Structure formats: C-alpha cells, structure tokens
C-alpha cells in the first residue's frame, strides 16, 4: 500500500500558496486494509475514508468513465491494481495531476508528503511554470463540469492562459451540446465559487472564449457590444462594465450575494432597443425580470436572489440619492426593506459602490452615497416607533394611519440628519 498527497494541495504548495485542504490517494489497498487501520469509510459513490486522527479524506486509486450526458453519471472502478498514473489521468488539469509520495510518521500516526520526489506523469510542473491551464487527457471531454471548473481556475490564477488545444476541446464540447445537460445546482455551485475568486472576470472571459456563456447565461452574454453613454461610462461596452464591476467587488472583498447582485444588476441593458442606444430607460425593471429567470433556472439561493433583485431595481436611485428629498430617502429605505434588514441594506450599498467604481477612470473615486445613506438610515432608525404609534392611537388614529405617522417621524429624523451633514 502506497499513499500520495494529490491535487490542489500539491499545486498550491508548489505555487507557494497556503495549503488548507489535503487530499490523499491510496494505491494498492483494499477497503478492508484501510478499515483495519482505523480509517472510517464515508464514500457513497466511490471508496473514500477518513483518517482516524486528522479526519482528512483518503480515497482508493480509481478510474472513472462517463456513463451519461451532462455530469449525470460516472462508472467508477477502484481496485488495488489501479495505478497512480491511472488515477492522476482522470483529473481535469495537469496542474492538478501531480502527486507527492507520503511516508508514515509512526510516532504521530500521520503521513508526511515528500515534495522532493514528486510524481508528475502529465507535465503539471511544466504548466505551472509556464502558467498554462491544460487538460490531462481526452477524458476531459467526458465531464462538461470541467469547463466550469477550468473557468473558475482562470479566475483564481488570473495570469494563467488556457492551452489552445484545451480551448479547442471546450469549443467542441459546447458545440456538441454537452453543457446543455448540466445539472442546474452544479452550474450554480461552480459559478458561485468562481465569483468568489480574486479575478471573477476571468471566469467569464473563459466561458465566452469557448462559447459556453451563451448556453449557461445568455442574459449576461448579450451585454457585450451594447453601448452605454460615454459621459457616464467611458468604457462604453456594457459587458466590459460588468466585468469591471465584478472585479471591483472582489477588490473590496464583497460576499457572494453582493457579487451575484453585481453580475445581474444591468441585465436589462441587453434588451434595450437598438434605436434608443446608448440610453437605457427602464432597464432596471427589465433587469429584475431577467434576474428572476436566471434565479429560477439555476436555483439560486434566496439570499443572493433577494439582494440582486433590490440592486437591479434600485441601483439608479441609490446613485442619485444625494439629490433626494428627505421623504424620497425614506421611501427608498422602505423599498429596500432597510428598516427590517439593515445589514442586507449595507450589502446593497456595497454592490452599488462596486457599480459606480466599476467604470473606466472611476476606480478610485469615492462613493459618498454609501456612508450617507447608512447615516440617514441610522437617523430614521432612531425614531421610537412604539412611542409614535402610541401618540397616533391617542389622537384617534388606527391601521395605516399609524404607519403614516411613523413614516413622517422618520422623514423628520432624516431631514434633521441631512441638514447636519449635507450631501457632498
């Protein structure tokens, strides 16, 4: 029995990056041999075991073959005769197909990888040095999820290029309809992970380069080539703007719901009639409608969906909020449900800041709307609603009239706060 550290742990070690997750493969062993050493079997679809102390996963060496279209089934074969080279061959990219032999530390009951004796049959170290994302074998085409995974790695390793032969294979897979059969949950999973990388725009560059974005997110694909007013958008192209917004969200460390909102905030611009360009009147409502379609199709979690909907509808109003009257500000806060969900409102404002700064030449420009609206929200929240309601009832008011009294009290609080700190 031989044990190797494999995959991302080896790759990241060679790149000098922090190694968080350790993956191990066991060659020449049976399930019985591992359980006899205290390993706990947990694999449902193939033999995977947890180390009795570290709880890290150890998988028996295996081969895989696709048995259905669109990542709906794989035939797995795991046996002692499966070699390390065969196991590495099933992996997606050469940079993920490097193994480090592990030697047991008998005193600790652990395994220590030897990075001076790497096993690299498919040139992963060469591609790491050349900064190339390359498929290992033609088995890449058997799993269309690998297109999404490669695009995600393009976002993580932004200075890597895609090998021409790999891009050609991805094109063939898309042309053959392989991505059309992908399970929606898996598409969302990879999309979400890619959005959280350091350069999410590179994921969409990769998906566009192979034609996959048109199949997975046509609402996003159609934004390229759509003109915007150069006065407000010097980058002009809506697709370019969208990518700048996403990268700004990554730069500001935004959470996933904010990044998804950034992705979808301008979808409606893709349906603006050509004869009215570069104006996009009413694109906010069109964006919200298209967003609903995307969320239903990909089964997007409610937290992401709800923030994206508010951002799509209200980002223009938030940008212009410095011109609003106190009453208009309170109405905006009410539409954003800011009184019930102030933390979500803060995320909505962050998405709007990413939108404003995701423009050519505006990357370093302050966004005063964000701190100002948070200040005005705090002022409106300071209203003692119970006291106002009691006063309204004492004056003979009931039902919606009580809400109107509370609304007016909040307007007055915003008026006073705005007077103390006027909009810049």
From Swiss-Prot:
Cofactor(s) it depends on: Mg(2+); Ni(2+)
Amino-acid positions noted as binding Mg(2+) in the UniProt annotation, renumbered to this chain: 21, 23
Enzyme Commission identifier(s): 2.7.7.72, 3.1.3.-, 3.1.4.-
Catalysed reactions listed for this entry: a tRNA precursor + 2 CTP + ATP = a tRNA with a 3' CCA end + 3 diphosphate; a tRNA with a 3' CCA end + 2 CTP + ATP = a tRNA with a 3' CCACCA end + 3 diphosphate
Note: A single active site specifically recognizes both ATP and CTP and is responsible for their addition.
Subunit structure, interactors included: Monomer. Can also form homodimers and oligomers.
PANTHER family xref list: MULTIFUNCTIONAL CCA PROTEIN (PTHR47545:SF1)
Name recorded for this polypeptide: Multifunctional CCA protein
Organism in which the protein naturally occurs: Polaromonas naphthalenivorans (strain CJ2)
